[in-house]
């Protein structure tokens, strides 16, 4: 008798451990890269800060499943998610290449916009693409109560009975395919 399958037991845990190992490996590579000490320190601090931001964003994303979420809430969360990853990558290159503080600030804004674009695109694909196109069941985020930007906007735009129905279905555990489809049409 198996209480759980191998993937369920080791899949997510292994992924988290592998990510932690890769993160520490990246810090090791940077620390031994041979760049000037000041640049290495700046990049290490950047990695630490953006790693913290990504984890904060994931925590916020989970909490949003259980709370009403505003556009401001989403912006805070999204500014720390993919935007942090793009910022870390772009800033690392800029710092090591000797970019000025002004250039780094401009690149940070670019990274934030790229990150927002990535998150919005990923959420739209996750909601509307077929399983064949996306590799996951369509509407999976809706099914678990996530609140991507387009759902937050929909909640702000709907009124009366439609708002109540929409919100009720979003809060429902395991909505049916028909209910998910109804949410998609709003």
Predicted regions and their residues:
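Mobile late-domain/C-terminal helix-loop "cap" segments
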Residues: 158, 164-186
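Mg2+-dependent prenyl diphosphate-binding active-site environment of isoprenoid biosynthetic enzymes
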Residues: 1-163
């Amino acid at each position: 008798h198996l209480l759980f399958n191998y993937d369920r037991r080791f899949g997510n845990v292994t992924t988290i451990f592998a990510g932690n190992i890769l993160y520490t490996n990246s810090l090791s590579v940077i620390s031994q890269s041979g760049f000037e000490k000041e640049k290495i320190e700046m990049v290490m601090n950047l990695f630490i800060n953006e790693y913290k931001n990504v984890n904060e964003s994931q925590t916020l994303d989970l909490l949003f499943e259980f709370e009403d979420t505003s556009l401001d809430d989403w912006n805070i969360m999204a500014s720390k998610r993919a935007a942090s990853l793009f910022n870390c990558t772009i800033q690392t290159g800029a710092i090591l290449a000797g970019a000025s503080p002004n250039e780094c600030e401009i690149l940070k804004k670019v990274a934030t916009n790229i990150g927002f674009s990535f998150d919005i695109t990923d959420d739209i694909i996750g909601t509307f693409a077929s399983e064949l196109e996306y590799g996951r069941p369509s509407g999976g985020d809706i099914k678990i109560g996530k609140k991507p930007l387009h759902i937050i906007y929909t909640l702000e735009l709907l009124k009366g009975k439609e708002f109540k129905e929409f919100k009720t279905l979003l809060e429902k555990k395991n909505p049916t395919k028909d209910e998910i489809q109804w949410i998609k049409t709003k």
